[in-house]
Amino acid sequence: MTKKQLAPKLEELFASNPGKTLSFKDIFRSLHLDTHPLKMLAIDIMEEMAWDDFITRVTDNSYQLNMKGQVQEGVFQRKTNGKNSIMPDDSDKPIFVAERNSMWALTGDRVRFACMARRKNHIKEAQVIQILERAKDTFVGRLSFDHDLCTLISPSNVLANSIIIPRRKLKGGKDGDNAVVRIVEWPDQDHRNMIGEVVDVLGKAGNNDVEMNTILAQYGLPYKYPKNVEEAAEKISAEITPKDYAEREDFRDVFTCTIDPKDAKDFDDALSIRQLKDGLWEVGVHIADVSHYVTEGSVIDKEAVKRATSIYLVDRTIPMLPERLCNFICSLRPDEEKLAFSVIFNLDEESNVKAYRIVHTVIKSNRRYAYEEVQELLEQNGVVDGTGEPAPAAPKGGYKGENADALIMLDRLAKKLRAARFKNGAVRFDREELHFDVDEKGKPVRCYFKRSKDANKLIEEFMLLANRTVAESVGKVAKGKKPKTLPYRVHDNPDPTKLETLREFVVKFGYKMKTDGTKGALAKSLNTLMSACEGKREQNLIQTVALRAMMKAKYSIHNIGHFGLAFDYYTHFTSPIRRYPDTMVHRLITRYQQGGRSANKEHYEELCEHSSEMEQVAANAERDSIKYKAVEFMSERVGNVYDAHISGIQSYGIYCEIDENHCEGLVPMRDLDDDYYDFDERNYCLVGRRHHNKYQLGDPIRIKVASANLEKKQLDFTLAGDL
């Protein structure tokens, strides 16, 4: 055995025994060093390790690992390439953890660790000495049988070792089934594998329903509704009582409509409009009165708290509330009398709010519109989408279409609101969204882009106005007074470092932007950039990088305003069927209207934090369902060649996004065989050492679809020549 072979074995032996004194005898026995030359070589290497402060001499013939500094705590991050790390609680700089020092911790585990003495020419390393709390104890994957041995194949590949499932713990699971498995025995020094038991068999991998439920299970999201919650929903009466009518404003005779996606079933919101005296318009924003039917602390409410949001996968909705409530009792369906919580505005022709009131109402929607229907009506009356201009004056015979006067007036008022919002410093992000049409088996047959049009923006502006007004009604108080507790939707200013990264990035495309100055100046600079790149090849890429520079919006009782919307006060009031924070806001507004005291801050901040977390988890699941359908769609197009652009660059290859459908795949580094390429992280490019050829973010590129891996939701591309 050479020095080069023996040194790593000695390092691993000491690293695996932190705090333990190892005598020469222990070391020789552990490493099977039974000849005099090998023993002397080991002693020489240990002297060098002690000189490097990697180990400490305890006696003349014993050493122990040098654990430098105090023991700390942090969160473990496992990587498939072996570059594991720990994020210490008191730092934002991760510390490298070699696999041999990981104690087989998994991503998200809270661990206790000690920093090891840094060896010459080595990066800072840590040793996990205790796993304090497991991030999760259930995993989702495919059951794989090899003779009598069953293991769980996880698509994420971030397990330290295999999960073995004894036959008696399979719960009927068969080879090739997707399953949810709970760990019953974690690894230790004697047994490196995890032992698990099947808690739910999802079904045969590849089946659409099974794969969608698998995505939900991977994020710990529900794919079934508890029976007791469904039963509780069945007992709720939809009847509107004489007391309800007496206590509410009656809007049943005022023109009211809903405008939603064509496949929507849960109608959260409706708009009413009528002309008042003195040239004013009364616009009612009517929201389903969920809190009337869902009592705080009930089994339905507890389940809604847990879920916090509805989840929208490509081919299905997993509702926050039981179907009887979200699609029937609460939903503002046409020609049915419904209870609503409403914000009623008196607006002048310029959409200035002259007065408002927040009241409980009874409404009766006259018509259920799809966005496409309203868009068609607007366009046939002279509206040019995206210009911000309302319909021209009505011709002699009047506007064309059912309820055209009302809808065109709503559009005109909405456009005034929108113009004022952007003038006030709101940031404009109009992104295309990838959508799929699927057949009866869930298979994608067509992909297309959806862009927000004037009909969508009509609804958006009135919802924003209602949300802002409700937030102001509680949060805006006289100087010296404390506002009552309310969950706000807050959005912090962008991260200055990320903004500078964005500025450096867009310069490469010939764009300029300012990253300093007031919030308004920054918003103006961002909007100028968005307008300048509109319609260009790099538009989607620049919007993606710009969005990464933004902070994430979240819920909090501590109001800091909303940067993106340029609102000092903002909340979520308009979607209680699909968002729990809206239900919280409804309850608190009712409580305060009835003279109630301010609600408990700590309790509501906890609910806000949970809602923000669940919103992010749901968004991740939704993205995964889109990825799955994109890979499934492209799996029938393997071998096809497409125009694309480089959307991401890593040390292991280049990510490319197909121009015609935004499906993304990887050209692995091994396929770039005309040169050896170095990764220039600062300039977002790969540079060839010999020929200096560059692959840069945003560059056009021609690719061929090489393979589609549904289990991993990954596409692999190869280069297909120059454009």
What residue ranges belong to the model's regions?
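Charge-lined substrate channels and their catalytic hotspots, especially those that engage the 3′ end
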Residues: 1-284, 291-337, 368, 373-376, ...
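A short macromolecule-binding patch
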Residues: 93-98, 159-165, 662-673, 677-679
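Electropositive polyanion-binding surfaces
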Residues: 29, 180, 185-187, 204, ...
